[in-house]
């Protein structure tokens, strides 16, 4: 779309431990998951005041247990770029809502296949996640 800004400001980055830890707690009922190919999304909604920012979506990226910092950072960059270009799928859904969607994107594939499977699987996963929050 012509008028959209495809930015990824710091306020949308999921950095606080108290927001990240509940996403990985298996005993919680309010955490959902979407898995498509090599990408898994963990998500939950929280009150906007709890995040510290007035942003509709906060997202973090975990490349998994990839050996070597260069390859791990490359996978993280691919995940961030894939989300940045398609972020409006989620942001538009949560713009008018009083809560914030917190998402952790996990890469669960082979590092050699990252450059092909992330652009293929991440958009599908984001679409499935957005479909869960249809009005």
What residue spans do the PLM features occupy?
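Positively charged, solvent-exposed patches that mediate nucleic-acid binding
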Residues: 1-135
